């Protein structure tokens, strides 16, 4: 600059970014666990099925919550809260290839790809797209229905599309 100080182009350190994400997730989940413990709420992680009006059988899990441990137990309760979470849909026609990732895998990529194809114009895929666009990836979206974010207010979707149009090279609707 004019004063003799130049700043280079911004650079993203994906490893540090991922580390920060993990810290935030750890704080959030740790905070929820602490609040539950403080209120004497028993938490169980696993796949459950009600076996009575006040009993649930749980097959416990570990890690990300999807790996079954083989341990089952029946939990008695007066009141039950189910925090179901979510799991990405496996598309049977997709090849088993490290370049194909779901939303969980997209949050763990080692580097920012130059180009990405997002299958599905739903909220989660578009959210991932806006993140990777901000990090420098070029994006295309394929959606088999006639509009993005099905189920969302159409007027809001139009505003979102207008505000984010430059993030996406192509949005292909009614496309399989």
Residue ranges of each PLM-predicted region?
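Rossmann-like NAD(P)H-binding beta-loop-alpha module
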Residues: 110-152
